[in-house]
UniProtKB/Swiss-Prot annotation:
Function of the molecule: Aspartyl-tRNA synthetase with relaxed tRNA specificity since it is able to aspartylate not only its cognate tRNA(Asp) but also tRNA(Asn). Reaction proceeds in two steps: L-aspartate is first activated by ATP to form Asp-AMP and then transferred to the acceptor end of tRNA(Asp/Asn).
Subcellular location: Cytoplasm
Region (Aspartate): 199-202
Intrachain disulfide bonds: none
Residues binding L-aspartate: 175, 221, 450, 491
Reaction(s) catalysed by this chain's protein: tRNA(Asx) + L-aspartate + ATP = L-aspartyl-tRNA(Asx) + AMP + diphosphate
A GO CC term assigned to this protein in UniProt: cytoplasm
Source organism (scientific name): Bradyrhizobium sp. (strain BTAi1 / ATCC BAA-1182)
Sequence positions that bind ATP: 221-223, 484, 536-539
Keyword Cell division: no
Keyword Ligase carried by entry: yes
Name of this chain's protein: Aspartate--tRNA(Asp/Asn) ligase
Alphabetized CDD domains for the sequence: AspRS_core (cd00777), EcAspRS_like_N (cd04317)
Amino acid sequence: MHRYRTHTCGALRDSNIGETVRLSGWCHRIRDHGGVLFVDLRDHYGITQCVVDPDSKAFGLAEKLRSEWVVRMEGKVRRRPEGTDNAELPTGQVELYVADIEVLGPAAELPLPVFGEQEYPEDIRLKYRFLDLRREKLHQNIMTRGAIIDSMRRRMKEQGFFEFQTPILTASSPEGARDFLVPSRIHPGKFYALPQAPQQYKQLLMMSGFDRYFQIAPCFRDEDPRADRLPGEFYQLDVEMSFVEQEDVFAAMEPVITGVFEDFAKGKPVTKGWPRIPFAEALRKYGTDKPDLRNPIEMQDVSEHFRGSGFKVFARMLEDTKNQVWAIPAPGGGSRAFCDRMNSWAQGEGQPGLGYIMWREGGEGAGPLANNIGPERTAAIRTQLGTKEGDAAFFVAGDPEKFWKFAGLARTKVGEELNLIDKDRFALAWIVDFPMYEYNEDDKKVDFSHNPFSMPQGGLEALQTKDPLTIKAFQYDIACNGYEIASGGIRNHKPEAMVKAFEIAGYGEQEVVDRFGGMYRAFQYGAPPHGGMAAGVDRIVMLLCGTTNLREISLFPMNQQAMDLLMGAPSEATTKQLRELHIRTNLPNK
């Protein structure tokens, strides 16, 4: 018989009745029923009920057991007494009648319980993550994460992709965030950087003659804390392909992502034949470039109905041609209480309020806006929006460049408040035609909008002849249920176009050579057209596990202050370590 176990705690069934077995695991729950001790023994695979009678030689030791002690139990498998089956457990028809117990690892008093799913402060959970990971929901999330990554790998290989590993120690590059720097002992005063993404290496692979690359890649970014991103590091399904156009990438990757979602959606419908939504259209209809298409609300430009109208605030705004009025339909939202609630919410978001019209019985418009613009214009708005009796519409006015984010938040808020969002499906879409550049208000200069290595639509000619802020890129995202879960593009594979693209963003040719010397050199020796994408593993797992917190699907995450409370990182380096690296610290004044 094996030293520790003949079966796992999830393995015993009716067919094992009468067998003498050994189980090892953690004491999940201990109960005393009339002098008989019941110990639910748990391991990675499940739970088995173990029974210790007072006349058993193991009873004295069993009385000393406490939660989360690790023990080995030996005994006979027997049928549970009639009426005591537990249908929620695969082992729920049997129990182990214990003859012998060995304590393998006692446990100190627990700082948080493993049994149950009660909430505990996050810092306690992260400090004692090894206990937290024993809890059923989190344990299952981590197992689901592994299975999702397995599904990604299998599907990528079915599509003809080959897995490569790219370097972790690399050179610093301007990719939008700060790098984590690693000092070189051998080259004093010089630093490696941890990769923000394997962007350059995967493009270099295509220039090295490989055709279809992927990896589950760790990425590192020294960013300020954000609610929608884990501090420090995250993982992505990184992909690159040679001799492809945008449609080729879509054709290869849409079945992979759809298939992964279908594998783990638990029966929820998953979009097939994803819509292609241009970036500008996404902002206009949904107020975001990662729309939640489960929300049926589409915003519309209703400026014409307010131009020259009796509502002077909007009418005066519209005298400036850059300004517009957008309507946010609210099906079933035509009550004064709801409209007032939305108005208060808008003020809480730092806005002056939300104008609204309600449509009463008979289709008559009501509310301050309706009174000011009159029944004819109100009816025209109703016709354009397709609203019905009992509906409402909210209005946002000004420069769309400045209000579209708020309009998108208002659309989401209306959808949530009126229960319009179908929570039981996954709505996926391609967002396409991103702008190549944007104007950086802080630095007062043109900057890259997304990936600096993307091919501009129109190529070098567009870079030479067009206003940079009008140039679109062969760049695309995947949106799902209000999250960006992937981003990619067709790459700029011609050196002269690459230099020009960076020049527009304020980088001289020498700086391009210094920053991207390896890739720049590779472009001189025959670079194939290529493109790819990267899908966020963490966000995909989060969606499929039904949580909104990335820490609930990560093994050992940092807290929001980018501290690893379990391992005590970051920590101070020793004087010896700093001396070897020729580094002296210069701490800011507190």
